[in-house]
Amino acid sequence: MARYRRNRSRSRSRRRRRRRGGRGGRRGRRRRRHGQRRRGRRGRERTRRRRRRRRRSSS
């Protein structure tokens, strides 16, 4: 999976470097990747907590 993502980033980086520049493109990608990881972990934790609360209230 990691290799496939890197290949995609290289093809996109060439296009973005001409428009935004290498620095802006790299920073934007890093922020997006971290954001997805944090949202995924927080989202799973919240759903688990909500389900437990519903079960307790029903009991």
From Swiss-Prot:
Protein localization: Nucleus; Chromosome
GO molecular function, one term: DNA binding
One Gene Ontology CC term in the entry: nucleus
Region (Disordered): 1-59
UniProt keywords, alphabetically: Chromosome, Developmental protein, Differentiation, DNA condensation, DNA-binding, Nucleosome core, Nucleus, Spermatogenesis
Tissue expression remark: Testis.
Tagged with keyword Calcium: no
GO biological process, alphabetically ordered: chromosome condensation; sperm DNA condensation
UniProt entry tagged with the keyword Ligase: no
Main localization (coarse): nucleus
InterPro entries associated with the record: Protamine_P1
Record family assignment: Belongs to the protamine P1 family.
Purpose of the protein: Protamines substitute for histones in the chromatin of sperm during the haploid phase of spermatogenesis. They compact sperm DNA into a highly condensed, stable and inactive complex.
Record protein name field: Sperm protamine P1-type
